[in-house]
Amino acid sequence: MLHSKEPISSLEDMVGQEMRGPTRVVTDLLGELGATPVGMPLPLIPENLSKGVISGTVLPWEVTPSIRLAELVSNHTELSGDTSLYTAVFIMAMNWDSYEGLPDDLRQILDDHTGKGLAASTAQVMLDADAGGRNVASGNTFITLDGAEIERWKAAAQPVVDRWVTRAGEMGFDGEAAI
């Protein structure tokens, strides 16, 4: 989700935008899309929007009320369908030896409440959390990029994907398989 002072309805609209990115990869992505990427922590977004240091940010809806983003920007751009600008990965991990050291009944509880079931329910919680941020911004402008425009953004973003795959390979991982 892009939140910006000026409307962003095409790839060309990204040019000249000073956009805050949450991670190194997303910051690289913003640069490939034509924006001037700016890295900064979340708490600095309101001040930097107010001062004109940035003109927008990439941020999930559920976070926006906590920094009063809807009061600082009036445009919100999202991609149509189930496409998103990027994906954040959350991992719940446990040391294997610790897991193996648990009694069978406790391992069974963990097995029953993790994996695909936990992933699906967590994804739904994240989707449901968007409603609060959307409601707060209800008087603002919402822009949804259509399929043809999304394809243009994907083509522009491909160098970021290629670099990620290369870096993964350099670390001994199959980046293509991960994607």
Residue ranges and their predicted role:
Residues 1-179:
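N-terminal secretory/targeting leader peptides
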